[in-house]
Every structure is written in C-alpha cells, then in structure tokens.
Amino acid sequence: MSIDTARSGSDDDVEIREIQAAAAPTRFARGWHCLGLLRDFQDGKPHSIEAFGTKLVVFADSKGQLNVLDAYCRHMGGDLSRGEVKGDSIACPFHDWRWNGKGKCTDIPYARRVPPIAKTRAWTTLERNGQLYVWNDPQGNPPPEDVTIPEIAGYGTDEWTDWSWKSLRIKGSHCREIVDNVVDMAHFFYIHYSFPRYFKNVFEGHTATQYMHSTGREDVISGTNYDDPNAELRSEATYFGPSYMIDWLESDANGQTIETILINCHYPVSNNEFVLQYGAIVKKLPGVSDEIAAGMAEQFAEGVQLGFEQDVEIWKNKAPIDNPLLSEEDGPVYQLRRWYQQFYVDVEDITEDMTKRFEFEIDTTRAVASWQKEVAENLAKQAEGSTATP
C-alpha cells in the first residue's frame, strides 16, 4: 500500500514522505494466546471460538480438564461446538462421531469400528491465573519450557478480588496496532488523557516491557482510570509473547496505595480482525469489604474499556504504516516491531536483533513542559467560559 501526496510549494529540498505498508501477514503469531476465563468454559457445554482463521471448540471432560479442538468434524464437516459433551468426548451433532481431548475419535455409535486414521487437531492448552491459553505455532512445534505465562502472585487468594473481565471484537485491524502502544508515550496524553511523567521500555527474549509513571490531566474528566490529577499511577506492563500482557499497577491517593493487576490480551480471528480481552483484579485494602473491592475492580475494568474504545476509534480510521516518521520523543517503534517480528517467522529465522536486550528511556522534559502549558491554557479557557455572562 502506498499513499501518494502532492509535492508542496516549499522552497526547501526535503522530499515528500510517502506512507509504505505491506499487506498484513497471513500467518498467525507463534505463542500462547488467552481464550478467556476458565469459569466461562466450565459449565459442561461446548463453546465456540473463532480464532486463527478457523473455528475451535472448547469443552471440559469428566475430570473438568478443558480441551480445545478444531471445531469442524473430520467426518463430514459438522460443527462440534454445536454438539454435546458425552463423557470425555465431544459428540458431533451431524452423525454423533465422538472426539476426545487428544483429538482421537473414540466412538462412532452406528459403525463397527473407528477408522484408525480418525484424528483431528488438538491444541496444546495451559490453565493458569484463572484463564485458558492455547499454543499456536505454524511449524507445529511444542511450546519451549522457557516461553510460558507466569503465575500471578496473589491471584486466587483472599487478598485479591476475582477477575472483572471484558472483551471487544476489533474488525479491520491487525493485532500489531495494539502492540505498538507499548512504546507510544504521547498517545496516552492525547487519546487517554493521562499525563506521562516517566516512560521507559525494555525488550529481551520473548518479553517487552513498558514502565510508566503518570498522573491525571486537570483539564479533562474522561471517565478512565487517569482522572485524579493528584494520584500518581505507576505501571509495569510486560508482554509475555505476542499477545498476553500483565500490567502491575500502583496508585497513590488519599494516603493509600491501591494495587491493581490488569490483563491486556488478544487472539487473532483473521489477519485483519482480532478479539481484545482485558480484566482486572484489585488487592483488598484493610477494612474494605469484598463487595466494595469487587466494585473497584469492575470500575477499573470499565475505565480500561473506555480507554480501549478510544484506541479502537483511532484504529478504525488510521492507515497501516510500516515506515512511521518519528521524533525523538516517539519511542523505539522500529525496535519494538523487530522484537514482534520474531513471532511471525520460523524459529530458525529468528535473528539476534529480534531478541537481544534493548533499553530506552524517553527524555520527558520537553513533553512535560509542553503538556503543562496546554493543560494550563485549557483550564484558563474553561474558567473564562464558566464566568462568561450568558
């Protein structure tokens, strides 16, 4: 894709910058992808998930173990997600062929025997942090032991709430759009009405981390989690692979420190559509009831939802761009994209510059000064408007 623009009448010799954008990759990222919360799949029924260019079925066996198979029956193409769980197998609604969690056909009630080649694709799963993950690898390799989803300390104890969880289906955009946010400090000010004060990135191996300290903007009440200008929010957000981020947050307000853990994750539906999921748990404060703590987690998740809706509005209307024109304060976009590329190439084609440790801290001096001036000007205009005579 190339967007041409007319040459300006300027006297300088600078050439017009053209936007370059190749087609979105047709393969899906290698790595762990979260499909949702365990509790949403543990009702004894089959569940349909559109992902990785096909349809999957999630079902629990008699021991409660969740299994994920390709949803289309290898017999005549029936949709297993519309079938019935029978014992440890999922039965196709078309002809009652039954498939266990390993993808093997276990029974055909009307047939004398099961064809020995009757096997479908079973996806490698992981149950952790109250969530279900599947491993995707176009080469068919199993997940390496050192590439996994970490256990979240404290989850499942009485000290923390349970997940408040939400999802959005994003059409017309590739997953890379959301991953770019890892390095995009300025968009937090203009899109999410946060005021970043400190911003740093560290990439290494299969992880990419964003460190940010921010406050709210005095001139904007957005309904997000950044509204209080007197509360500092400290965030350490790490992608573990291409699609699953854990964000550890601390917020100081009214003499108390509130600890929140935010999950930001997604899985691809196609190469230009994905499902974005996010959830929050909050550490319970002394003297705060479980109901109030759960309400805090829900409020935080709702604020995150509004923030992502702001992002989606941008994604729906922006052009994809492979050669972004950057300033010094824009962050290491190209380095992040090199890191991200490792998940879209064969393992043997991963290069050192995709995985070696990289650190970059943005000098926020100029940005903070400019934003403080903008906020002050906006507050002055608001004051003039409130005192104006009708």
From Swiss-Prot:
Cofactor binding note of this UniProt entry: Binds 1 [2Fe-2S] cluster per subunit. Binds 1 Fe cation.
Catalytic activity as recorded in UniProt: androsta-1,4-diene-3,17-dione + 2 reduced [2Fe-2S]-[ferredoxin] + O2 + 2 H(+) = 9alpha-hydroxyandrosta-1,4-diene-3,17-dione + 2 oxidized [2Fe-2S]-[ferredoxin] + H2O
Gene induction: By cholesterol, progesterone, AD and cholic acid.
Binding, Fe cation: 181, 187, 192, 311
Pathway in which this enzyme or protein is active: Steroid metabolism; cholesterol degradation
Pfam families in UniProt: KshA_C, Rieske
Cofactor(s) required for function per UniProt: [2Fe-2S] cluster; Fe cation
An example Gene Ontology molecular-function term: 3-ketosteroid 9-alpha-monooxygenase activity
Domain Rieske: 32-134
SUPFAM superfamilies named in the record: Bet v1-like, ISP domain
Keyword list, A-Z: 2Fe-2S, Cholesterol metabolism, Iron, Iron-sulfur, Lipid degradation, Lipid metabolism, Metal-binding, Oxidoreductase, Steroid metabolism, Sterol metabolism
One BP term from GO: cholesterol catabolic process
Binding, [2Fe-2S] cluster: 73, 75, 92, 95
Enzyme class, UniProt record, top EC level: oxidoreductase
InterPro entries: Cholesterol_7-desaturase, KshA-like_C, Rieske_2Fe-2S, Rieske_2Fe-2S_sf
Protein EC: 1.14.15.30
Biological role: Probably involved in the degradation of cholesterol.
PANTHER family: 3-KETOSTEROID-9-ALPHA-MONOOXYGENASE, OXYGENASE COMPONENT, IRON-SULFUR DOMAIN CONTAINING PROTEIN
Known partners and oligomeric status: Homotrimer. The two-component system 3-ketosteroid-9-alpha-monooxygenase is composed of an oxygenase component KshA and a reductase component KshB.
Name of the featured protein: 3-ketosteroid-9-alpha-monooxygenase, oxygenase component
Organism, as annotated: Rhodococcus rhodochrous
